[in-house]
Regions:
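Short beta-strand element of the conserved SAM-dependent methyltransferase core
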Residues: 34-36, 110, 188
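ATP-binding glycine-rich phosphate-binding loop
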Residues: 13-38
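ATP-binding pocket architecture of kinase catalytic cores
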Residues: 41-65, 72-148
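Short, well-ordered amphipathic alpha-helices
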Residues: 34, 64-73, 196-197
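ATP-dependent phospho-/nucleotidyl transfer catalytic cores
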Residues: 21, 25, 47-58, 113-128, ...
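Conserved hydrophobic/aromatic beta-strand scaffold that supports enzyme active sites
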Residues: 31-33, 109, 211
Length: 214
């Protein structure tokens, strides 16, 4: 069993760790809330990064560092209040890297935003607020034409690539279920030209690449 307190000791935290317990219901990384003993020191979010998905952890963390620094810069420029609640604060390891490798797993740490929560169901108001937040996110990053961001999962949002995978799966019909869903497959393939429009426009120089997440 992993000694989470020992893992946390490799980061430049303030205060004494009182408790570490699982946090949230995420499906990719293992996430823990690190509670410190006294109210004048922050709590933290500790994550074990899923290396099966994120194979280049240094790149992943550098992406996050760049993006959060740009968001923080723009918030400071507009004299926003409570900035530490509006963007992540990364906590470096004691060797100043933005992750710690224990010989088996990669770990990262951020300051916990008190009172933050996730929602399992989306209401119209939540969808609206999410749209506003995403629009602001795009605005904050739009002033850098070619941001130094690397692809942590190559072709993850490349619809042409994904449709190619889909067509291969159709040809294999590995689970012999194609006949049951053929109308849905036909409808999806009928929309393929529209679905790939963004990639075509980018190749033609008409649509810039945008950062969606790290």
């Amino acid at each position: 069993m992993t000694d989470l307190k020992a893992i946390t000791s490799h980061f430049a935290i303030s205060g004494e760790v009182a408790e570490i317990k699982p946090l949230g219901s995420g499906l990719i990384n293992d996430t823990f809330l690190v509670t410190t003993r006294y109210p004048d020191t922050p709590d933290y979010v500790l994550q074990r990064i899923n290396q099966a998905i994120f194979t280049d952890v240094p790149l992943l963390q550098e992406n996050i560092r760049y993006i959060t620094s740009r968001i923080r810069y723009h918030l400071q420029q507009r004299n926003a209040n409570d900035i530490d609640r509006k963007t992540l604060t990364l906590v470096p390891a004691t060797d100043e890297r933005l992750y710690y490798y224990d010989g088996n797993s990669y770990w990262r740490l951020t300051i916990y935003i008190a009172g933050s929560k996730t929602f399992e169901q989306v209401t119209p108001d939540l969808a609206y607020q999410t749209g506003r937040a995403f629009g602001e996110f795009q605005y904050f990053l739009s002033d850098i034409p070619n941001p130094p961001i690397g692809a942590t999962i190559p072709d993850f949002h490349n619809m042409e690539f994904r449709l190619g995978q889909f067509r291969e799966a159709i040809a294999r019909d590995k689970a012999a279920r194609l006949a049951k869903v053929q109308p849905i497959v036909d409808e999806l393939l009928g929309r393929s030209e529209e679905m790939c429009r963004a990639e075509r426009l980018h190749r033609e120089g008409k649509l810039p690449k945008r950062i969606t997440h790290c």
